[in-house]
């Protein structure tokens, strides 16, 4: 058993014998069931720094979305010396560390693909280095090049037609959450020692492929840990030993996260479940009288300020998929422990309070791990913050905890992972709506008119027959699932080989569990299309080649989103059927296959490449996002819509089920207290049914329309909304995506 003087006052034994942050938390945290009255406002330092950062953000917006970009230096742990928000204010920064040498400057990260790194530069008027081009073209292979070299013609065709899209073959896969708390609790030297022991115990026998690879990966992890120490030294800190107080705990933890974002540009770079962990240090300092509540809030405000600054250089096709510059610095608060104790601490309040001290913001992606058993005061405070800022998402702790335990993090938008124990292979989405059209048209793509899918016999009847369509759809789904898994196996193999996440994996157990994430797009449209074929009459409209390019519906049919089992059961069937098809395939590195119903803002891109559907959706128009009902389908109010989504079993979609709802303020009540109370009741009822996720927006469409027409108004500079799986500044969306958000249902009644 090891012991450090920095651990004075901390209880427990197991976490001192092995790397076990959960045990440390359970033995030392202080549940809080009071209200928010203890919270402190922003300090003068916070106001000055946030004011300086807002000026930089305004300048960034004026320059078209990018303030500055690196073109000569490849990002690494030690590529840069120290950087600050404002050199003249650097002594005010309680938490330090930038991705590059300047605030909001985007790093050059070519290992995912030199073409992408260069295109990101030229898109915004920057000229990339000719020398780096030669190095990463002639001498060093990148992830992107390796993937495309190995793709089959069928894979390329599926990618081109967007029946599979958004794949992490042109960007870092992300979704790996290092247990950044370990840096604070143990210090880097102890973590190196633990990894060296793993290395010594790996490969004492036959040198198989797996053993050789693991030894190399552990060696890279140890090197990354050493690099983290050098990175911190540039800022004058020695992180070799554990943190001795709250400020060091916040700083050490942030350095761990900074190492990740300096070396990877993953689509999701989550922070993880840190609030209750940090509260232990803050509470110890408060009890000892060496920290005030105002100083504690300042630490959290400054840490969150850093999360709000995370930026990556992206290409236009990426921005179409993931609009508004998200990084998914997802950070969780709340939850209930396995022993039944609430894990709400004062620090959970402090993180939510940053949205009041510094205003709404998309990052970090604040996530409440919700249960109706959470303290009432905390539920009401979270609901109040949601109503005021539309910046918070909620996930059902009661359905996730039996699967992931009580120390999981959200590793992207809505997907859970056991902190420090697991990693996830991110896999984008398959277009199940386009797949239905392939089933009808015999694998011919309705947009390109090319044979993309297998050359099965098309449906040629004038009116679609459910008993004919369904088996053909199942057959085509099975083809798509097989191709999809093969594509992802190839991508994940190449990412491990050419763009391995050693900084993050250094903070995860060596004996790591892996999940293989897949996803579904067009979910509600498939449900309603099959329902229309089954319960109404759907006539196929064909072009001169016989291809079905449109549909006429005669009669009415049950629609998903109205608490009608006839439609909702089709959704349950679709989810289960697709997951079973995925699960029967071989997945890379013995990973466990999961799926999600989640689209991000790629619902617009998917729709743009998908023809008219039998549910009445027009050709090449946006899909409904995530697990949301189709636009205009919801006729029975918010609660009926929520009930439909709640019927989807979480255990068949362990990668997450995203549901985004917009509620007119008057629908919730006519006073702040009434609205807060009603929102809590809505969420209690929704999550008690076993539903997984809810994005809450509280505003009317008039505000969206005004923000779209007058983005220059000061009130809209930080106007934040929740979209499928994340939050975004509304004025940072493209006009097309703004119109998509405006077209969604805004519930005027519960």
Tell me what each language-model feature is.
Residues 2-750:
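Conserved catalytic cores of very large enzyme subunits
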